[in-house]
């Protein structure tokens, strides 16, 4: 009956007919749009179109894998790295990339630049020792992450979280602001939490001078920057590279992308390639466990 209705248009009001027609229209509309994007938008850059098409279908594969699993725990991504390496643009790009497919994506802003931190947290910490600031802040960052996980989005993208705090604590330790024992205890507490709660860490990197040049070229002011100077950037980068080494020792899923001689588009492709590979493997591991594959 539904088949005849579909073929001969005998019952346009049949709910199943309406739904089937919607699905067919969607298929043809998507095809038309695909041809338009390929032949009009990317007419002069088919190579770019083909690269985008590949990651598009890899994203679809990940989406389908996600939907067949009963495990609905979020995939957690932390972004960290040298200032002025395109981190914020990457986060926004990835949010758009995944949301357009239908993933529920939650973005957690950098805690220490948030209004909550400035108005509620910082006033209670500003007169305390630096090591207290660097050990108290992670507690709030952890709470922020745990609250997001409870809301069960598909993907959580965090702008500087527990791993980034580890970088700052390493910097503090190197500047003699923390004892060796305090530093050791901090790592003992937070490294397991990082491994347990964050699926992947994406770090963007460049040298201090390139970072400064980018800042001056992106803004109109010539005044001296409050934090962004070569000394502070070199100290941050030293600790960032220390944590890269620590990640290798502790088996933390840390991925560094050097942006010095690459544009934003190149880094975007590299990062999304890394994420899709890791997400796919993450979901396959869950599938093997759930369906008891041998």
Which residues does each predicted region cover?
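Walker A (P-loop) phosphate-binding loop of P-loop NTPases
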Residues: 84
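Conserved lysine of the Walker
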Residues: 87
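Conserved substrate/cofactor phosphate-moiety recognition/catalytic segment
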Residues: 96-140
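Hydrophobic anchor at the beta1->P-loop junction of P-loop NTPases
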Residues: 79
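A glycine- and Lys/Arg-enriched "phosphate-lid" helix/loop adjacent to the NTP-binding pocket
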Residues: 168-241
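Glycine-rich phosphate-binding loop used to anchor ATP phosphates in small-molecule kinases
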Residues: 133-192
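Hydrophobic positions on the alpha1 helix immediately C-terminal to the Walker A/P-loop
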Residues: 90
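NTP-dependent small-molecule kinase module
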Residues: 2-60, 65-67, 216-294
């Amino acid at each position: 009956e539904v088949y005849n209705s579909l073929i001969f248009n005998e019952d346009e009001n049949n709910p199943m007919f309406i739904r089937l027609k919607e699905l067919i229209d969607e298929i043809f509309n998507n095809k038309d749009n695909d041809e338009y994007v390929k032949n009009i938008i990317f007419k002069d850059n088919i190579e770019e179109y083909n690269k985008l098409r590949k990651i598009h279908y890899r994203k679809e594969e990940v989406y389908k894998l996600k939907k067949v699993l009963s495990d609905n725990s979020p995939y957690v991504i932390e972004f960290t790295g040298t200032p002025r390496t395109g981190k914020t643009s990457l986060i926004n790009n990835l949010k758009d990339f995944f949301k357009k497919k239908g993933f529920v994506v939650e973005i957690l802003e950098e805690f220490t630049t948030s209004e909550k931190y400035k108005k509620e947290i910082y006033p209670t910490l500003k007169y305390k020792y630096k090591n207290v600031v660097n050990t108290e802040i992670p507690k709030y960052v952890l709470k922020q992450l745990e609250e997001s996980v409870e809301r069960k989005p598909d993907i959580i993208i965090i702008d500087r979280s527990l791993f980034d705090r580890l970088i700052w604590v390493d910097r503090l330790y190197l500047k003699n602001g923390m004892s060796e024992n305090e530093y050791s205890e901090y790592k003992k507490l937070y490294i397991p939490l990082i491994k347990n709660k964050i699926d992947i860490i994406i770090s963007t990197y460049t040298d201090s001078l390139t970072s400064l040049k980018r800042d001056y070229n992106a803004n109109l002011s010539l005044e001296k920057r409050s934090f962004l100077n070569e000394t502070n950037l070199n100290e941050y980068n030293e600790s960032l590279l220390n944590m890269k080494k620590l990640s290798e020792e502790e088996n933390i899923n840390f991925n560094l992308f050097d942006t010095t001689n690459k544009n934003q588009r190149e880094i975007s492709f590299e990062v999304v390639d890394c994420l899709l590979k890791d997400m796919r493997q993450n979901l396959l591991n869950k599938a093997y466990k759930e369906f008891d594959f041998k």
